[in-house]
């Protein structure tokens, strides 16, 4: 009974708090939350499972379902935005308004999968991988070179660096190697906070936001008409950066 109101006290459920306590700025955690690491590991595995299903004649929607099956088997019930699958001309578009279609994989093709699971614990993952189908040496070369410059750029990440500086490091490699940035918003990634992407905007030429916590880095580019993309999460910790 409440002494002030004279009404009976109703027991409350435990206070609800986010699975990932967000601490922006230099007081961010040294290491990424284990749940975030798990979510990204699952995203990478699901992307690879989807690509493993890819073969000539298989449609974008069927590739998407292969990725969804992998997520469902891991207990995932939701994604935070659609799974993007691109083959043929559709590899040149990767955007939330462009869902998988009935376009089938050709004998020589590139298959792109961008997947975004939410784990049962509430953590978000974000991963893009590509696979070359058939005898397509130009595509193999484009994908290999993009992945190489991507990971070399990630090695230059440092805690608190401005987003536009990371963009510049990537851009100064893309153009000399013959790549044209394809992202519709002219960026190479975005922030990823608990329950929200893009809260700190994008990794682009105009964003001076210091990078702390999780950011998705995803160069999406074409060379000689062949579109390729790769994406990883980076944890910008208090003292070091870690590729998840």
Where is each model-derived feature located?
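Active-site neighborhoods and metal-handling regions in enzymes and metal-associated proteins
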Residues: 2-244
């Amino acid at each position: 009974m409440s002494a002030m109101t004279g009404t009976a006290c109703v027991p409350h459920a435990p206070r609800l708090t986010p699975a990932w306590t967000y601490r922006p700025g230099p007081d961010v955690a040294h290491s990424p939350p284990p749940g975030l690491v798990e979510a990204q590991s699952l995203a990478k595995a699901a992307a690879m499972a989807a690509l493993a299903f890819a073969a000539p004649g298989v449609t974008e929607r069927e590739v998407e379902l292969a990725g969804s099956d992998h997520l469902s088997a891991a207990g995932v019930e939701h994604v935070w935005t659609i799974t993007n699958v691109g083959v043929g001309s559709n590899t040149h578009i990767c955007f939330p308004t462009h869902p998988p279609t009935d376009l089938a994989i050709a004998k020589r093709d590139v298959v792109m999968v961008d997947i975004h699971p939410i784990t049962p614990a509430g953590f978000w993952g974000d991963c893009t991988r590509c696979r070359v189908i058939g005898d397509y040496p130009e595509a193999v070369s484009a994908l290999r070179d993009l992945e190489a410059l991507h990971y070399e750029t990630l090695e230059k990440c440092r805690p608190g660096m401005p987003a536009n500086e990371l963009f510049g490091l990537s851009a100064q490699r893309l153009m000399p190697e013959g790549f044209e940035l394809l992202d519709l918003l002219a960026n190479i990634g975005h922030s990823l906070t608990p329950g929200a992407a893009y809260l700190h905007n994008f990794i682009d030429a105009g964003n001076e936001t210091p990078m702390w916590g999780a950011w998705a880095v995803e160069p999406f580019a074409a060379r000689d008409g062949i579109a390729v993309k790769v994406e990883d999460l980076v944890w910008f910790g208090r003292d070091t950066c870690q590729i998840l």
